From Swiss-Prot:
Source lineage: Bacteria, Pseudomonadati, Spirochaetota, Spirochaetia, Spirochaetales
Protein family: Belongs to the LuxS family.
Gene: luxS
Keywords for this protein: Autoinducer synthesis, Iron, Lyase, Metal-binding, Quorum sensing
Name the UniProt record assigns to this protein: S-ribosylhomocysteine lyase
The enzyme's E.C. designation: 4.4.1.21
Catalytic activity: S-(5-deoxy-D-ribos-5-yl)-L-homocysteine = (S)-4,5-dihydroxypentane-2,3-dione + L-homocysteine
Cofactor stoichiometry and binding remark: Binds 1 Fe cation per subunit.
NCBIfam families in the record: PRK02260.1-4 (NF002604)
Record flagged with keyword Cell inner membrane: no
Quaternary structure, from the entry: Homodimer.
Length: 157
């Protein structure tokens, strides 16, 4: 079986950052998959499930309600390894093109004070598994990277 692209990245050299994971074209439409890497794989502790779940709910809601990006957002969700998120967007983008959007997103999560979107029994399959305080903590740690982003945080090793 052919190895998928994400398994060809050397995770021993991967830093937190923003990376273009892949670009796909379907019927002349380009989709860019962004690797929002919050943790250094196999070095830092993974994001606890309740925090990653909360970031997913708030992040997806904020992105789909962003006036500039709403029509371009296809998907926002956690990686199975719990070291970050994937963002799939319509269009041909590079990592640097997403710095402002992703910085805005995680700043909004740090300052989020409303009820967690979609966190009721009717709206979520695991509605009790949320932790807003830890979501804010993980987001604030990631913002430290974003606020001082370097080339090594924008290009896969």
């Amino acid at each position: 079986m052919k190895k998928i692209t994400s398994f060809t990245i050397d995770h021993t050299k991967l830093n937190p950052g923003i990376y273009v994971s892949r670009k796909d074209t379907f019927e002349n439409v380009i989709f860019t998959t962004i690797d929002i890497r919050i943790k250094a794989p196999n070095i830092e502790p993974i994001i606890e499930n309740a925090a990653i779940h909360t970031i997913e709910h708030i992040g997806a809601t904020l992105l789909r309600n962003n006036e500039v990006w709403t029509e371009k957002i296809v998907y926002f969700g956690p990686m199975g390894c719990r070291t970050g998120f994937y963002l799939i967007i319509f269009g041909n983008y590079e990592s640097k093109d997403l710095i402002d959007l992703i910085s805005w997103l995680f700043s909004e999560i740090v300052n989020f004070s409303e009820p967690i979107p979609g966190a009721s029994h009717k709206e979520c399959g695991n509605y009790k598994d949320h932790n807003l305080d830890m979501a804010k903590y993980e987001s604030s740690k990631y913002l430290q990277i974003l606020n001082n982003i370097k080339e090594e945080n924008l290009k896969y090793p």
